[in-house]
Each structure stands twice: as structure tokens, then as C-alpha cells.
């Protein structure tokens, strides 16, 4: 019983999907002393305050890797209680401006697309005769090493990593050029723009 859980809790985390969020919240009652953390991507703070009749609301974007205590967790607006709750699960990023925080929702939406790149790469190896376990191990280790290298060198900027990872007429340059010509990165940016519009509406 959602209402019973709310009544017995001091902190309520809203984790329902956006398409049913408004319907469910309208049926529930939140006392003004309750602290609310919303994980609902497309319901903004103003609407949340109207739906819950509560002003003590924070939006947060924890991603699945918090299971292994990794990854960024965006909190808007900054809130000490929410930060203390999430700081053990990942790297907390506090944003004052909700419009700016929506940009982080947009970039967080690339998760499935990222995993699909791993999936396509591994399946390509498998179709070429590589054992599935070997292919999955190789691809996961490859992307792990690239991600760790990016973390270690983030102060240099990612443009430098792009430049440093290719040689004139080399294999990496060829793949980058082919993807660029196919407008892969343009479509990637367009997709994030579309998500930004969706979460900002």
C-alpha cells in the first residue's frame, strides 16, 4: 500500500515510470514534513510540488551502476540529506538550475546505446568465429580499459583522447571517419537534443 508506506516514512523516493507518475501521485497524500526524492525523468519540480502539495522535493538521477557503487548521481537542487543518502552509492553532482540538470538526464539516456555498441562489437566477433565467452570478455575489458583511461585523463579533455588514439590513415582514423561520414555522431547529438526537449517539457 503506497499510502501506508508514505505515512510511515520520513524520506520518500518516487521511482515510478513517467507515464504513470502523475496518475499515481494525484491519489497519494504527502504531509509537509516528508522529504521527497523523485527519480521520475519527465516530471519537473514545479509539477511535482503541485502533485504532492509538498515543497521539500529533490530530483535525482541514480543509474544502475550504483549497484557496484559507481557512476554519477545528479541531485537538483542541492540538498544535504539527499547527498548524504547517495554519496555511498556513487559520485554526487549537485546542480542548482533545473534546466541545466535536464542536460544530465539527456546524457544519462545514452546507456542502452552504449551497451548496444558493446553488443554489436561482441556479436561481430562471434559471427567471425570467436567463442562467445572470449568475445564478451574481450569487449568488456576493452571498454573498461578505455573508460578508465578517460577517467585518468579527463583533465586533458576528450578531444585530446580522440586525437591521441588515432594515427594518420590508421585503423582508428578509418572507423572514426566512416562513422562521421555516416552522420553517426550527428544523430547521436540529435538524440540527446530530443531527450533534452522531452525532459524539459
Where are these regions (language model features)?
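Internal alpha-helical scaffold of NAD(P)-dependent oxidoreductase catalytic cores
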Residues: 47-56, 71-153, 194-199
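Rossmann-like NAD(P)(H) cofactor-binding subdomain of soluble oxidoreductases
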Residues: 1-75, 79-81
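Residues at or immediately preceding the N-termini of alpha-helices
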Residues: 2-3, 79, 132, 158, ...
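Structured helix-beta-strand junction loops
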Residues: 8, 31, 88-89, 168
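NAD(P)-dependent Rossmann-like dehydrogenase/reductase catalytic/cofactor-binding core
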Residues: 140, 144-201
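Transmembrane alpha-helical core positions of polytopic small-molecule transporters
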Residues: 15, 111-115, 168-169
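Small-residue helix-packing motif on alpha-helices
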Residues: 5, 21, 131-139, 161, ...
Amino acid at each position: 500500500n503506497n499510502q501506508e508506506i508514505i505515512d510511515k516514512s520520513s524520506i520518500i523516493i518516487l521511482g515510478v515510470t513517467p507515464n504513470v507518475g502523475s496518475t499515481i501521485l494525484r491519489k497519494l497524500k504527502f504531509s509537509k514534513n516528508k522529504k521527497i526524492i523523485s527519480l521520475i525523468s519527465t516530471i519537473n519540480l514545479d509539477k511535482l510540488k503541485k502533485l504532492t502539495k509538498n515543497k521539500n522535493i529533490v530530483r535525482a538521477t541514480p543509474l544502475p551502476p550504483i549497484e557496484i557503487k559507481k557512476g554519477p548521481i545528479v541531485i537538483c537542487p542541492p540538498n544535504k540529506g539527499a547527498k548524504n543518502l547517495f554519496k555511498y552509492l556513487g559520485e554526487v553532482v549537485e546542480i542548482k538550475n533545473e534546466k541545466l540538470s535536464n542536460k544530465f538526464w539527456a546524457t544519462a539516456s545514452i546507456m542502452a546505446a552504449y551497451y548496444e555498441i558493446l553488443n554489436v562489437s561482441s556479436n561481430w566477433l562471434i559471427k567471425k568465429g570467436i567463442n562467445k565467452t572470449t568475445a564478451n570478455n574481450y569487449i568488456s575489458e576493452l571498454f573498461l580499459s578505455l573508460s578508465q583511461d578517460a577517467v585518468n585523463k579527463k583533465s586533458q579533455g576528450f578531444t585530446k583522447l580522440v586525437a591521441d588514439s588515432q594515427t594518420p590513415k590508421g585503423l582508428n582514423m578509418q572507423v572514426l571517419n566512416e562513422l562521421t561520414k555516416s552522420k553517426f555522431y550527428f544523430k547521436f547529438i540529435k538524440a540527446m537534443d530530443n531527450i533534452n526537449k522531452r525532459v524539459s517539457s
